[in-house]
A protein has these predicted regions:
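Hydrophobic helical h-region of N-terminal Sec-dependent signal peptides
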Residues: 8-13
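C-terminal motif of bacterial Sec signal peptides marking the signal peptidase cleavage site
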Residues: 16-19
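Alpha-helical segments in soluble extracytoplasmic regions
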Residues: 29-117, 123-144
């Protein structure tokens, strides 16, 4: 169970999402991927630090500690990644693909916030679809 829980944390931390973007000029796909990966890498590093603190005593966290970790650290971090990536303007030709990615990621966040106990207890990762979409788009730092 610990392995699956930390696997979900890693997947969530690396979640790659992108959004509709602001009113800025559209980026090229290469620019979008570069900036998106930088956003995810920063978020991942922050979560790695938090996870190291969680397991610093060498003892596996109990269920309540895991739930608190997800609620207090993982989900806000990933939501921040989603929000930051949504500020990027993807290439016009990729808008639909990017919209699907962000919708999938937000759905996973909402599901997780709605029943964190079930997410922690499950071997399934609610972010699998978003991770797959991120990886397919080239956001390697965002799809773990």
């Amino acid at each position: 169970m610990m392995r699956s829980t930390f696997a979900i944390a890693a997947a969530v931390a690396g979640l790659g999402v992108a959004g509709c973007g602001g009113d800025d000029k559209a980026l090229t796909k290469a620019e979008f991927v570069k900036q998106g990966n930088a956003i995810c890498a920063k978020g991942n590093a922050e979560l790695e630090t938090e996870e190291e603190e969680l397991i610093a005593d060498g003892k596996a966290p109990d269920r309540e500690e895991l739930i608190a970790f997800f609620e207090d650290e993982v989900l806000p971090n990933v939501q921040g990644q989603i929000d930051d990536l949504a500020e990027l303007t993807p290439p016009e030709a990729d808008q639909g693909e990017v919209d699907e990615l962000i919708a999938s990621a937000q759905e996973a966040i909402d599901k997780s916030e709605g029943d964190m106990e079930a997410v922690v207890a499950s071997d399934e990762n609610p972010f699998d679809d978003a991770d797959e979409k991120a990886g397919a788009y080239g956001l390697a730092e965002c799809a773990i």
